[in-house]
């Protein structure tokens, strides 16, 4: 039902708005559907100024879309949330949410109230998470490093670097293990941001390399400076080191020309005093986000220190965190006096400028507070390097999650098929209206194995039926419970034991994607009224340039 309002806008209510929301969600899911799985296809996105992005990553695709419909925006934000929280599973979370909405709409057409559907979905989600944690998880302790490599390979399988999965999986696992540190509670932590990824196009993917230490895409400020410093004391500055000049508007009236030289000399001395304060604390590596002029460089060269200018703020923050330094935006303290203390310095075993691949880089090795690692990516062109970076980010997040949660689940649609059988049986044990909603939830989960099979050019109906038969047997017959690891083998088009094949995903990816998808679907299902206000018309007395052209006012 649509009708005018006393407010300046339109109103849609009831069935109409619900169907509209479901269609919007389905159209968003259809965009990313074909990119799911190891044989998913890539999307080329061109923005309004002509920048091209070629990607397979669900979160990136949806981030670059200009979406107007409010329900569709919810799904785009959902993918972004999954990317930030877990790092992987962004495509599947959107597909599941859209399928849940589609099936809820079918129930709505059968006159089942949305509140019953919502409570059924909540119940099904809770039960599904419990079933995963009790029956489908594999502890990583019994699998060791191989498990981490397999989880990374599974994450990369659908990406551009999947063809060299073994090479990149080892690189990712080594990088994540290199940045491990223990927090105040004694828990191991793996800050993925400590892995700096640099891209250089040219050469092949296989010439990418992992470097221990933080790699800075900068060079020393002057050729006269040392290229290697052992036992480095690092000063991190967020301001320019340049000759102090009097501010604009300051007028100095002098009668003696020699006084002019004294003023210039004093300007130089102020800068020299600043630099002496920094060097007096023992600092021998100075990193700044601003510029360093020639006069300041001369003082650093004389002191035998290494100075690097135009460091990215992001890099400076990470180096400060790793080395234990304090980033200073000014030397002035609260009293207005300029001071610099030794406690503000960070420490590293070695800072060296090296030629890696085709570029000169500065490496900061064995920092005091935390260790760091860097990956230099090589690829044919910029599009390829960007997509490789996104793929590596997903893989790094997956390995981090496996190490933190210490559990994985089989991939290839195994979890979804097992849950669909379990929830169907669970639904029949319910004697209330929620039974229908739980059964629809179970059916919705099958969209993942279905889509995987369709994208791999296989017969999805046949494959999913076989998969369900295996999982039903596993749940009915305790002697054959090992069949619960059966998932899809998409290259050969048949079911297989994915635990033996090493197709693993972190448990948290599956659990979070189920929870997030259910919550997003419920958020949209609760909407039964849309009031859209019209934009205010601006009364422009003078009119626009186009109006003037049409009226002929410019022809005089």
From Swiss-Prot:
Its EC number is 3.6.1.-. Component of the chaperonin-containing T-complex (TRiC), a hexadecamer composed of two identical back-to-back stacked rings enclosing a protein folding chamber. Each ring is made up of eight different subunits: TCP1/CCT1, CCT2, CCT3, CCT4, CCT5, CCT6A/CCT6, CCT7, CCT8. Interacts with PACRG. Interacts with GBA1. Interacts with DLEC1. Mg(2+) binds at residue 88. It catalyses: ATP + H2O = ADP + phosphate + H(+). InterPro entries: Chap_CCT_alpha, Chaperone_TCP-1, Chaperonin_TCP-1_CS, Cpn60/GroEL/TCP-1, GroEL-like_apical_dom_sf, GROEL-like_equatorial_sf, TCP-1-like_intermed_sf, TCP-1_chaperonin. PANTHER family: CHAPERONIN. Component of the chaperonin-containing T-complex (TRiC), a molecular chaperone complex that assists the folding of actin, tubulin and other proteins upon ATP hydrolysis. The TRiC complex mediates the folding of WRAP53/TCAB1, thereby regulating telomere maintenance. As part of the TRiC complex may play a role in the assembly of BBSome, a complex involved in ciliogenesis regulating transports vesicles to the cilia. GO terms for molecular function: ATP binding; ATP hydrolysis activity; ATP-dependent protein folding chaperone; unfolded protein binding. This is T-complex protein 1 subunit alpha. GO terms for biological process: positive regulation of telomere maintenance via telomerase; protein stabilization. Belongs to the TCP-1 chaperonin family. The modification Phosphotyrosine is found at residue 181. The gene is TCP1. It comes from Macaca fascicularis (Crab-eating macaque). The keyword Kinase does not apply. NCBIfam families: chap_CCT_alpha, thermosome_alpha, thermosome_beta. The modification N6-acetyllysine is found at residues 199, 400, 494. ADP binds at residues 37, 89-92, 158-159, 412, 505. It is found in: Cytoplasm, Cytosol; Cytoplasm, Cytoskeleton, Microtubule organizing center, Centrosome. The keyword Chloroplast does not apply. The modification N-acetylmethionine is found at residue 1.
């Amino acid at each position: 039902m649509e009708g005018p309002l006393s407010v300046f806008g339109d109103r849609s209510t009831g069935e109409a708005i619900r169907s509209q929301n479901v269609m919007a969600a389905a159209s968003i899911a259809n965009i990313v559907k074909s990119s799911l799985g190891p044989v998913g296809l890539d999307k080329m996105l061109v923005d309004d100024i002509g920048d091209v992005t070629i990607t397979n990553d669900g979160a990136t695709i949806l981030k670059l879309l200009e979406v107007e419909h409010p329900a569709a925006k919810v799904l785009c934000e959902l993918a972004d949330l999954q990317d930030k929280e877990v790092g992987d599973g962004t495509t599947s979370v959107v597909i599941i949410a859209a399928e849940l909405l589609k099936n809820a709409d079918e129930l709505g057409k059968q006159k089942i109230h949305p509140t019953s559907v919502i409570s059924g979905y909540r119940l099904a989600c809770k039960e599904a998470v419990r079933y995963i944690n009790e029956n489908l998880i594999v502890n990583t302790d019994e699998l060791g490093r191989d498990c981490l490599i397999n989880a990374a390979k599974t994450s990369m399988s659908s990406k551009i670097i999947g063809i060299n999965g073994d090479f990149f999986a080892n690189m990712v696992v080594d990088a994540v293990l290199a940045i491990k540190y223990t927090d105040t509670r004694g828990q191991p932590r793996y800050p993925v941001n400590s892995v700096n990824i640099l891209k250089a196009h040219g050469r092949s993917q296989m010439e990418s390399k992992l470097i221990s230490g933080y790699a800075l895409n900068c060079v020393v400020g002057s050729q006269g400076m040392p290229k290697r410093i052992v036992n480095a004391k690092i000063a991190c500055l967020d301001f320019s080191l340049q000759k102090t000049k009097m501010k604009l508007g300051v007028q100095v009236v002098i009668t003696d020309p020699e006084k002019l030289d004294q003023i210039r000399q004093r300007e130089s001395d102020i800068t020299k005093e600043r630099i002496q304060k920094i060097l007096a604390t023992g600092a021998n590596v100075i990193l700044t986000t601003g510029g360093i002029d020639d006069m300041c460089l001369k003082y650093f060269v004389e002191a035998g220190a290494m100075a690097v200018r135009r460091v990215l703020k992001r890099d400076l923050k990470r180096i400060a965190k790793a080395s234990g330094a304090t980033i200073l935006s000014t030397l002035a303290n609260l009293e207005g006096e300029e001071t610099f203390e030794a406690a503000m310095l960070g420490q590293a075993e070695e800072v060296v400028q090296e030629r890696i691949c085709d570029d000169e880089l500065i490496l900061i090795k064995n920092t005091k507070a935390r260790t760091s690692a860097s990956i230099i990516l090589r690829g044919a062109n910029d599009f390829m390097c960007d997509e490789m970076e996104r793929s590596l980010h997903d893989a790094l997040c997956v390995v981090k999650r496996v190490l933190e949660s210490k559990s994985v689940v089989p991939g290839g649609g195994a979890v979804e098929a097992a849950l669909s059988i379990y929830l169907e049986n669970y639904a029949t044990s319910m004697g209330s209206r929620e039974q229908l909603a739980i059964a629809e939830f179970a059916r919705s989960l099958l969209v993942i194995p279905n889509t995987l099979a369709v994208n791999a050019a296989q017969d999805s109906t046949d494959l999913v039926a076989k998969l369900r038969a295996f999982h039903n047997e596993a749940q009915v017959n305790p002697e054959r419970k090992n069949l619960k690891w059966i998932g899809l083998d998409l290259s050969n088009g048949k079911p297989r034991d994915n635990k033996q094949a090493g197709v693993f995903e972190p448990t948290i990816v599956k659990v979070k994607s189920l929870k997030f998808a259910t919550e997003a679907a419920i958020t949209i299902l609760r909407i039964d009224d849309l009031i859209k206000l019209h934009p205010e018309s601006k009364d422009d007395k003078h009119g626009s340039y186009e109006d003037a052209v049409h009226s002929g006012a410019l022809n005089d």
